[in-house]
Curated annotation (Swiss-Prot):
It is found in: Secreted. GO terms for biological process: cellular response to hypoxia; systemic acquired resistance. Gene3D superfamilies: RlpA-like domain. This is Putative EG45-like domain containing protein 1. The keyword Cytoplasm does not apply. One of its GO terms (cellular component) is apoplast. Keywords: Secreted, Signal. InterPro entries: EGC1/2, Expansin/allergen_DPBB_dom, RlpA-like_DPBB, RlpA-like_sf. SMART domains: DPBB_1. Residues 24-123 form the Expansin-like EG45 domain. The gene is EGC1. PROSITE patterns: EXPANSIN_EG45. It comes from Arabidopsis thaliana (Mouse-ear cress).
Length: 123
């Protein structure tokens, strides 16, 4: 009985956490210009668009990202998973997304063939 309550509570917390997420767009990239001048920050990383960049103040912040649907003709790109990424770069002006994820992070939440997806994200 107590395991059921813990499981149910965990599911509720997860569901409510995404109900407060911000919608956006994600793409992926492979060429990084790190905020940390060459310090490797792993593979679960992202570049922030001008919307989030805030003169670099977002560097080092963590965001949870989940695919919320397609943005092109690739059917059903979402895996149903979420990923936690660290902002380590700036997506330059004209960037087609809110968050430009590493290929590894993108592949956790969507089929890389899609290239661009709708997302929900929160800090």
């Amino acid at each position: 009985m107590s395991k059921s309550i813990v499981f149910f509570s965990t599911v509720l917390v997860f569901l409510f956490s995404f109900s407060y997420a911000t919608p956006g767009i994600a793409t992926f990239y492979t060429s990084y210009t790190p905020c940390y001048r060459g310090t490797q920050e792993g593979v679960m990383i992202a570049a922030a668009s001008d919307t989030l960049w805030d003169n670099g103040r977002v560097c080092g912040k963590m965001f949870t990202v989940k695919c919320s649907g397609p943005r092109n003709a690739v059917p059903h790109p979402c895996t149903g998973k979420s990923v936690k990424v660290k902002i380590v770069d700036h997506c330059p002006s004209g960037c087609a997304s809110t968050l430009d994820l590493s290929r590894e992070a993108f592949a956790q939440i969507a089929n890389p063939v899609a290239g661009i997806i709708n997302i929900d994200y929160f800090p």
